[in-house]
Amino acid sequence: RDALWGDNVDRPSDRWESLGIKYDGWKNNKGNAGKIVIALQLAGDASLRNCNINEWCMDTVRALRVHTDRPIEIRTHPGVSEKGMGNHEELFKAFAFANFKDVTFINGKEVPWQEHIKDAYCVVSYSSGMSIDAVINGVPVIAVDEGNFAYNVGETKLKNIESLNLAPEPEVLQWLYNL
């Protein structure tokens, strides 16, 4: 898988522990509570590997709506410039005329990701670094591309939105140690 890096040797916990970041395990995000956060990325970013992020987002919302009625919040990248926001113009227009229920946009510059995901059911990401932040904070991730660093510890299929397959805690901890 593309999300594997380095020499593939399990690392001890000392580096992780030296950071002082606490991992409390997966949150209990089951049931009817919680929104879905879709993490947009900067259009043309190399980690997208020629994927059109706007088309991916539309396709993702369509696929999710087949399987869930949960609220969906599409989060813009916090580093997008005003000019760069123009790269999402097609996406904004498409959603303005689409009849999707309970889909909103969140400005990633104005809402800190920590606040945005604290009541999330899960984060859906192509290959955004927000996947790592979500896992560290116990929020499940659907990582749809093998280049997503959380691909090996999260769900990988949108159709499983209501029954997420997540890595067991020992695997997640080892993944964190290996980062």
Language model feature labels by segment:
Residues 1-33, 152-179:
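Leloir-type glycosyltransferase catalytic cores
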Residues 33-45, 74-79, 145-146:
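Short loop/turn segments at strand-loop or loop-helix junctions that form parts
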Residues 35, 71, 121-122:
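Structural motif
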Residues 44, 50-51, 86, 162-164:
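Class I S-adenosyl-L-methionine-dependent methyltransferase catalytic core
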Residues 45-48, 80-85, 132-133, 150-153:
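Short catalytic/ligand-binding loop motif for oxyanion handling, primarily in non-cytosolic enzymes
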Residues 61-109:
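Catalytic donor nucleotide-activated moiety binding site of glycosyltransferases and closely related
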Residues 108-155:
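A donor-sugar binding/catalytic signature common to diverse glycosyltransferases
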